């Protein structure tokens, strides 16, 4: 169970950020911010609901992944959680509550979404969320929707994690490792991609939609497809290589772990490559320093991958020639990592300031997702790769 004090400190930090955001945007000091978790949606032409995922700015305040929930922030007032619990015999509408987080919020229970109107001063409220048409139909067109300077400010601040957030991410990583161990064991036993995937879910005790992203479970040649989306069910007793990219979510915060395993019977050059890549990853982690730019880590990664390719006689060219010709990018077309938090690819990886100034990925590696200067309390991944 998370610490009640850590969560209270987290909420206090959010209150400070949101009050500063209102001042930054130059709106009235009496303004409120209404954050919507989102609404349930359905597949086109069908009555089957798409698995719901709450808006991350809502989850920042409330660890409840349910549709049509609202957090109302007003400076000087305790944050109000407008908890909509419909009367419904078709679905379980229970919202699990625990005092470690409920004690920091003023919870107002409502039966219908329409009931939120009595708590909203529309003329002085800024709405954050996806359902602009729905919320303006309910509260009026004068409601400010997704004010760009406000989103820029809040997105930028999301890169800096509180102690509570870091604690959730630590747990998410520890839980994912249990699943990765089970997946590795299943691979050694000759299970199929589908079987390995199920072993991961079972070990983590989660359903597919509860994971922070869709698991990638790739055997042999399919491991060369970066976002391989299938789960083959055929016999895999002779498979030599497993790549698994899978995480775990805790109170909205997700881990992101990619591992590659090779059997003893795999090609010796590949096994050597794998061992060296694991060493390379550790070296990259050791190189992280506050004040450096994340793009420097990526450039160092490309240099190290290139040197390794030359060392193993996979590429025959000098380091300088390889980098100029962008040969390492043929083997590592992705970025070395990204910010991590309420979204696996967390927001504001390119954002350089509160105003929303963007620094795009360098032309030599357009897939890089983070160009921020490294600062304390940031959480990001370091995940070099070498794909064939």
Q: What are the roles of these predicted feature ranges?
A:
Residues 1-388:
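Active-site neighborhoods and metal-handling regions in enzymes and metal-associated proteins
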């Amino acid at each position: 169970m998370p610490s009640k004090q850590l969560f209270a400190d987290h909420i206090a930090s959010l209150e400070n950020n949101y009050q500063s955001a209102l001042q930054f945007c130059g709106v009235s000091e009496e303004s409120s911010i209404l954050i919507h978790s989102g609404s349930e949606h359905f597949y086109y032409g069908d009555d089957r609901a798409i698995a719901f995922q709450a808006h991350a700015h809502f989850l920042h305040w409330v660890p409840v992944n349910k549709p049509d929930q609202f957090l109302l922030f007003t400076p000087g007032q305790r944050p109000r959680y407008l908890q909509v619990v419909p009367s419904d015999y078709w679905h379980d509408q229970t919202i699990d509550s625990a005092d470690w987080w409920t004690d920091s919020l003023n919870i107002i229970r409502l039966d219908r979404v329409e009931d939120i109107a009595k708590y909203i001063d529309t003329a002085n409220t800024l709405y954050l969320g996806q359902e602009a048409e729905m919320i303006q139909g309910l509260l009026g067109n004068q409601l400010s929707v997704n004010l760009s300077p406000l989103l820029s400010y809040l997105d930028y601040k999301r890169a800096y994690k509180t102690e509570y957030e870091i604690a959730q991410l630590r747990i998410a990583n520890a839980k994912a490792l249990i699943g990765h161990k089970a997946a590795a064991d299943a691979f050694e036993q000759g299970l199929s991609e589908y079987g390995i995937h199920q072993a991961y879910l079972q070990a983590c005790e989660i359903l597919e939609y509860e994971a922070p992203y869709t698991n990638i479970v790739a055997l042999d040649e399919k491991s060369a497809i970066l976002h391989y989306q299938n789960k083959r069910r055929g016999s895999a007793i002779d498979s030599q290589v497993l790549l698994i990219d899978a995480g775990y979510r805790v109170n909205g915060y997700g881990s992101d772990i990619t591992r590659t395993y090779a059997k003893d019977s795999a090609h010796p050059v590949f096994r050597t490559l794998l061992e060296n890549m694991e060493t390379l990853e550790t070296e990259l982690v050791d190189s992280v320093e506050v004040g450096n730019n994340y793009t420097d880590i990526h450039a160092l990664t490309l240099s190290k991958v290139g040197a390794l390719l030359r060392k193993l006689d996979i590429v025959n060219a000098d380091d300088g020639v390889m980098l100029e010709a962008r040969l390492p990018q043929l083997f590592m077309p992705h970025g070395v990592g990204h910010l991590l938090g309420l979204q696996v690819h967390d927001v504001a990886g390119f954002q350089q300031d509160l105003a929303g100034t963007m620094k795009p990925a360098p032309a030599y590696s357009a897939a890089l997702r983070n160009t921020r200067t490294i600062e304390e309390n940031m959480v990001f991944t370091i995940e070099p790769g070498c794909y064939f």
